[in-house]
Amino acid sequence: MKPFNIFDSNSSIQGKFFLEASAGTGKTFTIEQIVLRALIEGSLTHVEHALAITFTNASTNELKVRIKDNLAQTLRELKAVLNSQPASLPTYLDINCNVKQIYMQVRNALATLDQMSLFTIHGFCNFVLEQYFPKTRLIHKNPALTHSQLVLHHITNYLKQDLWKNVLFQEQFHLLAVRYNVTSKHTSSLVDKLLASYTQPISSYFSSRVERLEQISLWHQQIYNSLLEIPKQVFLDQLTAHISGFKKQPFSILDDLHHFVDLLYTSETHSSLFSFFKIAETFNFKHRLARYKPCAAFTVLENMSWVERTLEFCNLDRIFNTLLVDLQEYLKQNYTPWLSPDESVFALEKLLSSSEAQPVVQALREQYQLVLIDEFQDTDKQQWSIFSNLFISPKFTGSLFLIGDPKQSIYEWRSADLPTYLTAKSSFSEDKQLQLVNNYRSTPKLMEAINQIFGKISPFLEIPGYLPIEYHALNPQSSETFENPPHAPIHFFFYETIKDQALWIFSEALRLQKEQKIPLGNMVVLVSDSNQAFELISYATIPVSFSKNKSIFHLTETHILTTALLEAILHPENYEKISKILFSSLFGLSLDEVTTKKEDFTIYFQSLHSYISHHGLLATFYRVMTTQGNVLFSSPRGDLIFQEMEKLCGYLDTISSYPYHQLLHLKNFSETGRWEEELAISSYSEDLETLKITTIHSSKGLEYDIVFCPGIEKSKKNKSSSELLREMYVACTRAKKQLYLPISTQPPSLQRSSALTNYVKLEGTQSSAYDLAIHLHQEHPDLFSYSLPKDHGHATTVLNLPLLETFALKVTPPKTIFSFSSTKFLLDTHKDSQSIPYSKLPISKQQLPLGEKTGILIHKILESIQFSLLQDTEYLMSTIMRFIKHTHLEGFEETILKLLSKTFFSPLTFSSQTFSLSQVLPNKIFRETSFLFLENQELWQGVIDLFFEHEGKYYIIDWKTSFLGETNSDYSKSNLSIYIKQEKLDYQGRIYVKAVRKFLNQFEIDDDVELGVIFIRGIDTQGNGFFALNSSEDIPNFNPKAIQKCQAYH
């Protein structure tokens, strides 16, 4: 390849060139000079005819700034010449050139630089599609909505129209609906799951619904003929008896068996033949017992693979994938074909290869006179197809530069591949293959050492089917020198343990800071991944920060913690949201601590609720950190999480001043971050007093005075020898003055494959990295040095750091929050002396056990039951078993089922009407509803078991598992009245009714609210076990301030 020098007038820039730019050779400088030279020489008449494509948005912005600064500097020099002042102009300028004309050309370019086409590859593809193929772009776009909100809108529309029926059977969709049950606290909704997954590629899904229905019909016809020999009742009896040969399941299949056999013996085919998952799971081969005996009925099913077909039919992953594929097609047709950025690349490649695109191809060729494609080593086949189609053709008369370095191709996981790079290179003649040969980054001695290391590998890279890639030594051009006795420019240090390695690095960094006056911020520790970074940080003796260019959602729980904190602040009355953040690493509390201090924390978050509305999210975060900072910093990665939460809170404050808007944005952040690069928050530290730690991949394109490379010693899995060598090259070429390479003292047989051990193997003359270091030092003592573990002590450096400046935030006086639980103590002092001690009543073994645990479990069951499935006995039983398995209630399943059936189907008589809970519409029900309201300057909180609307009236239900006696008559209205007054439940009811009325008033609803108490142990169809409270009853007089120290329990 020919050397290329932009300032050499003999190095032409007109034509098509393949330019290799090794690390530190001034690639970006060369690109900006190519643009300037093209303007000066006239091959580029206007900057709007220039196209530059880079890898990331950050690179695009940097290049634009560099080009702008270069044009501005050149303009100043030209102006100086016009004013007959000393000036420095490019050497390729002809001495007799028209300086005034060039001045006007550069000034015009600077003023109109925004018209230059500067894109990432995805940006370029989107630009072409929008300009020339508008029909393939967004079909519907509402500027008031974000991309995520638009996708959510279309997902909702898809489901509302029941379009799933085109690809799924009703039984399959029912399985999905149960799996993604929105009333469950443990699962996400189907809509949320689809929103989180809509960009994912899908490989495993069902064939078309029509095809599957044909297969079901054919299957049924075949088995129907076999069934003619077995009477229906005999078939059913055999299958029923067959159950005993399998392991017992936590559900009954008797009703399903009757239904299944009915369908089998019907001549008409039903898709639900394969929907009996419980039968298939019961008769699964893996559940067979030793006493299993075959039967004729099951043999028929077995021969027709019914169990296998049913398990496949009910496979939730395939059902979801099938739905997702159809949804993706719907989004492409109704919103945008480009569900992910890469799809725009695929689409443009396909469109440009069609005959109808030739006018577009011609228009693009005519639009651009200069095309610069940077980081070409990271290009894939589709991208190269686009570029070659547009600009390699002789019909493109402008200039083209493909610029890259195969030695720095470390993004194979992003689809970049070297064969594509080499294919592109081979399409250029040898005289058009250029290279930058001068290094401006590293000191001459360090560059000489780097040349020595990589010059030993020949060929540097070898790809089957292509000419080998050689390492070409670079000419050092830096005028800077650096002396660092006793170390040579590349220093190998040996270590025994990771702790030894970390302490050596931190000790050496501190020495360089003191003796060489190099700020810690100009040094970097390059690691393989975040785990290695955090391990090193755990031994840090100096200030360090892990700098990464990833989204904050990539490694830590920052997103989760920030969301949980904001939800707790905005909903201080919601115990579940408060508990979530209290259990997290931000507070680190135990279950007992949260339970006993729940009211205190509600008061605390209520004070933060007021604070955030006046001071913003970031200030509120700092306020929380004044008490919780030590807890967070003592947790793994706590310092990094603090930095990220700080940055995220500050970012959200710039988005909106309304906390609820911030929470909405935060919940959609992780998904939208994939589309909007400006939303990705980098934790890259600019602090000069902090040693940086970053990954080798993140360091690409950056440079540092001092580089420590423990990342090349970390074992790597599933990486090719070629990629390991390229990673080592990238790591070593980040250094400007000094490079440190660690070597483990473990025997080679115990060392796993790493970039360094891979290098030793490729170099071939030494048996270990240890031997290599010794050999290099003996061969070039002025370039390489080494130190053994004994050369440094393990003395811990004691830093005399100044005391941290702290600040205190004004504490807002908290309000006491009252509840029925906290006031009950005082109310109990008014109890009637004739009250009945129900807790001492005898209880038979047939009754549910007494105690708080029983009440909690029954409440959990009632909380989770879907009202739409109350008629489904098997569903109710499976729900009950799910909660009571391995508890003290195991064995009471039938008793609980009977009690629940009575609870939901017994008539409840209120003053306005009589009805059962089974008649209430599921979509008009709120369960476990938390409230917090202000009454007479006092805050009241609580949780309502059930709140619903029925036929235009509003009702509250409170569940009670209190034991009043063995018979239903013990739960008569007269007995309940005594118990309710005794336990002050009428007082509790008044609090709940007040809370609901305040809630309804927000919607200008002034209707009355009635409250009923259901005693689950005694409810029946005769009116026992239910008591409707009189809402007009007066509240007993009391002074809540007298009981402020009482805790609230629910």
Curated annotation (Swiss-Prot):
Additional information: In the RecBCD complex, RecB has a slow 3'-5' helicase, an exonuclease activity and loads RecA onto ssDNA, RecD has a fast 5'-3' helicase activity, while RecC stimulates the ATPase and processivity of the RecB helicase and contributes to recognition of the Chi site.
Tell me which residues make up the UvrD-like helicase ATP-binding domain: 1-443
Ranges where the record places region DNA-binding and helicase activity, interacts with RecC: 1-766
Q: What is this protein called?
A: RecBCD enzyme subunit RecB
GO CC terms in record: cytosol; exodeoxyribonuclease V complex
Q: Which reaction does it catalyse?
A: Exonucleolytic cleavage (in the presence of ATP) in either 5'- to 3'- or 3'- to 5'-direction to yield 5'-phosphooligonucleotides; Couples ATP hydrolysis with the unwinding of duplex DNA by translocating in the 3'-5' direction; ATP + H2O = ADP + phosphate + H(+)
Q: How is the cofactor bound?
A: Binds 1 Mg(2+) ion per subunit.
Q: Which cysteines are joined by disulfide bonds?
A: none
Q: Which gene encodes it?
A: recB
Q: Which Gene3D superfamilies match?
A: 3.90.320.10, P-loop containing nucleotide triphosphate hydrolases, PCRA, domain 4, Recbcd, chain B, domain 2
- What is its biological role? A helicase/nuclease that prepares dsDNA breaks (DSB) for recombinational DNA repair. Binds to DSBs and unwinds DNA via a highly rapid and processive ATP-dependent bidirectional helicase activity. Unwinds dsDNA until it encounters a Chi (crossover hotspot instigator) sequence from the 3' direction. Cuts ssDNA a few nucleotides 3' to the Chi site. The properties and activities of the enzyme are changed at Chi. The Chi-altered holoenzyme produces a long 3'-ssDNA overhang and facilitates RecA-binding to the ssDNA for homologous DNA recombination and repair.
Q: Which UniProt keywords apply?
A: ATP-binding, DNA damage, DNA repair, DNA-binding, Exonuclease, Helicase, Hydrolase, Isomerase, Magnesium, Metal-binding, Nuclease, Nucleotide-binding
Q: Which InterPro entries match?
A: DNA_helicase_UvrD-like_C, DNA_helicase_UvrD/REP, P-loop_NTPase, PDDEXK-like_dom_sf, RecB, Restrct_endonuc-II-like, UvrD-like_ATP-bd
Q: Which GO terms describe its biological process?
A: double-strand break repair via homologous recombination
For this chain, the family text in UniProt reads: Belongs to the helicase family. UvrD subfamily.
Q: Domain (UvrD-like helicase C-terminal): give its ranges.
A: 458-701
Superkingdom of origin: Bacteria
EC no. given is: 3.1.11.5, 5.6.2.4
* Highest classification ranks of the organism: Bacteria, Pseudomonadati, Chlamydiota, Chlamydiia, Chlamydiales
